[in-house]
Every structure is written in structure tokens, then in C-alpha cells.
Amino acid sequence: MALSAYDLTGRAALVTGAASGIGRASALLLAEAGALVHCADRDETGLRRTYDLITGAGGSARTHPLDVTDRDRVRAAVADAGHLDILVAAAGIMHTSSVLATADEDLDRVLAANFKGVLYACQEVARSMTARPAPGSLITMASGAVDSASAGLLCYSVAKAAVVQLTKTLATELGPHAIRVNAVAPGWIRTPMTDRHDAAGQHRAEATMARISPLGRVGEPEDVAHTVLHLASDASAFMTGQILRPNGGVAMPW
């Protein structure tokens, strides 16, 4: 078995949030492992850059400009992609406000992107997989924020906690169809999203996370992408309903 378990030749993956950060790194690594990668994002410029990086390295990719909060667009992208073996639901946004300052529209916007967008992608891809039928792997993106309380991150943390429960429920329901469902809950990862968030605090959060990590650094998108590849591949054939935490040891829940 060895490294052949990570060979995705002949498989197809849909990656949302593929224009940057964790989504892009995951798309690149899945393509390097041999998968045809369907890259989806609302940022068309970033999406084209991801496509160019994949194809420039000899990989195979297609692009699907879409907003994951639009169920009809997600459904259309899944139909256009056709056969899918893997989903990486990595699209998401961050919002910062205290609990008392959180407005309805703030909560609605974050839940739409970070929970409903994941739900829509999982529903549409799972329907496609069960209709064939064929085994598959759905990978959701949770967050280390579900393991601790962080001031200002109510909307984000609530949405990511919902993703964890969605993942476990889907794993229970889809297991009989040979579809595995797992979540990745990264710690602080250096991405355009976290850079924008941390800039307001003069990058104190990143420095703090690096200091408290036993490994002495924050993560890079590639650190998470390798976890995604593991879950997408046959190397994790007996894993479902699990939450994997590439976080540098910042949190160690049992």
C-alpha cells in the first residue's frame, strides 16, 4: 500500500474556496496527487491563478465561479462537474465583533457562508455520489475556534461548531453508502483571511499563537492541505466522523 494509498489518479474533486489560502493549497496538492480538481470560488481572479498554478505544474483543473451561499449555483456546479469522488468545502469568511455588538445581519452573513455554504456543497455532492452509487470522501473545514472561546469570534465560532455537528451527522447517515465525512479544524494558519483579521491588531494574534505552540510557529496552508489529502485518500479508508486538528499543539482536546 504505502504511498500508493495517496494516489488520486482517476478521481475528481470539488474544492470550494479554491482562490486562496487553505482552499488553494488543497486544490494544488490534490492535483499533484493525480486528481482532476474542480476549483470553485467567487473570486474569479484568484480562481484563475489557482487554475494556472495547477495546469502549469502538469495537473488537471476546471473552474466554477460561484458563491457558495447560492444553492442553485452550487447545484449547477456539481452537475457540470459530473463524476465527483471528493469534496473539500473550504470556503468561508471571518467576522469580528463582541457578542453585544453582533447584529442580525452579521450572524446571518457568517452562517450563510461558513455553515450553509458547507451544507449546500455536502448535500449536492452527496446526492450525486449516492445516485451513482459510488464511494466518496466529503471533507469539511471547521476551526480550532470550536475548542476554545475567543472574544470577538461569536459568529465564526458558532458557524464552525455547526460544521462539526453537520460532519458527524453526515458521517452517520452516509456511511452505509460508503461515503466518509470528516472535518479539519485548523489552528492559526497564515492565509489572506487571517492576515486581514490580524492586521487590525498589529498581528499580535499570530505572534501569540506562535509563542504558545509547542512547535513555535503558526501554520501554513500547506500544513492543512496535507491533512486534506490524507482524508481524501485511501490512507484514511477507515476514518469517518472525525475531526483532525492541524494546530501545532495549541489545543490538545482528547
Question: What residues fall within each predicted segment?
Answer:
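Substrate-binding pocket helix/loop in short-chain dehydrogenase/reductase
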Residues: 98-99, 103-111, 205, 209
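Short, small/polar-rich loop/turn modules that mediate ligand/substrate recognition or access, typified
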Residues: 88, 175, 180, 239-241
